[in-house]
């Protein structure tokens, strides 16, 4: 491993599974080969092909953290319990200001969503609805954990189905190496739900017996539930406080199959690339791998494909010498939490120098012919171990761990307070934007969006708004698609089993690649990635799949709809339709999801994981999505018959749907192919403000509540930026929320670039707030705390509304066009007018999740 990289170590672990309420109980049980797959008690399993699962038997009311936070969502409760234990084992009494949290989940708040839907369909209305809707949010688990433990740095939710937990660990390590955090809680959480049980039942994937991974008589998987959280730290931070270190996290690899919505590539091609990428980045030779914690689900196709992948990545000889085992044989498949809990088992295997077994193994299979450590643990000297996770949508993830050996210079570095090993001192790729695309109420062309924005009268833009019905058949003002035709991009045959979200995502990705003039070929396809962001994801498919099950039971579970219920399916469709099979991930960060996707893409480009990445965000409107926002009190009231232009003094916003995509590349790659460059991404900031997690119903309507996240109690000490006076990074602790995000973006990562971001004061800032009238008391004040001379404020939300997870993407697109055209849709109080002939060299684009997460991205004109 390069000695220039900051080491990332594991100092704390926490888990709650079918084998107990702690990581210690988990480890002792798996060493014995004990499984916890028994009759399910928390949900009714009548009519399904299996009635067993790896269910957590611990009553939720006994979980201290869940009680303290007043949540009744199982997944959130599991995550809180695991986080509590992880911090206890890490011995961390107080987290540093830049601490982060990255959580992987496949199901998010599905249990709460099921209850909320049942209430809606029964016509029940009460004060609990807003609380349930907040628990439905996929980013709710990470933000609740962040709030509970006191996180102020980046809070990220990854939803790459069954690969999410491993992806979360890898991304958390990247945040530490890049200097964005010194401590990160990383892991995953999921709870059993009728959606998951009926879905896997519809695919005929469940076994009626405890699953038998890799065994010749395997016939399906066993579902599970729980959570796993690891505390990751920079080695320097851990050494400085004398922390116990369990293991080191080396690197991780991501890839997309681009093959099929549910089935793995039969030869494990994509999975092999993820394994090879992780090993190559780690500097670990394939024959040095001592142990593989396998994906091992117990389904015939998955296990044989993984066996092929291991052989392809390691080579036949090395693969035959390496021990493999499946933790799922003992706890079931924890879906988005699988990689997290299995990562903990891998870490403990290295720490204790024991390889846990594959339980329930009865007979060999010619297609699974490796050493699967059947039924009994093995003591062995271990240096390197990997954890594999592969998922629906063709997402593949591999994380490499190493038995910890202190760096020879770690003590001296701590004593000298050295920062030479941080990523800021490394040579990194500059990142540029070379392609853009959008689909919205304004149309499907970039010119259509700009034409609507360029109207020099904010009232005229309301002509794009129309009406839609919520779940109670009440009319609502929305911004919806009108002239989008998916057959212009996708054949009718191909689109039959795709939902609207998938079609939108594929279409906008195709347009962005076309605009960038980047052709994806067999030669470069593994170097072109896809990072997808969404706030509400697959709600359309969830409704189509779950409603018949709710009324008719197991026989109504439709296998055509179930694959589209996972949030990463859209990114998988992009890989299949464009051939972009490089790094692939899906991030959920509320209305800042596009910004989070772009930040992640930026990191991968800088790490040289890809030459180009399509960063996308998309969301669609359904009656139940509209009702969810209404329950939270976020939307503009529908005032009058046919009213589609609400008065400016109303509080709330107009909800929209649409998609946005940008192609980001390394500067060297863009120059080599003579690409047109729209702008450079010079830096980004991601922060979290815990006070906003349970204030979604007021955070964008009342300055007093939003103030907690946007404004600082310590601004007098911090001071404001001027061209000649730069606030010290150490003073970020006196800031809050969006202020810290903007300052981090301006700090940048410009050691190798021409842009000296410490001297930058942006010419304009595209605001995060959906309601223009709220910019004065809230976001404007936060901006004034950072900048002595307030930059121009701008927005396009008066045109297309608040497009959920794509909201910050449309702001960024408009910022690029403004920089190109020299015109700016400038905010004046509660109105927007076009400022002409403006010089725009640097623009900040702010984003907010609505519930505590903030992003700020610095765009600089490329010259």
Residue ranges of each PLM-predicted region?
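Active-site pocket-shaping loop/turn-to-helix segments
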Residues: 15-18, 63-84, 119, 128-137, ...
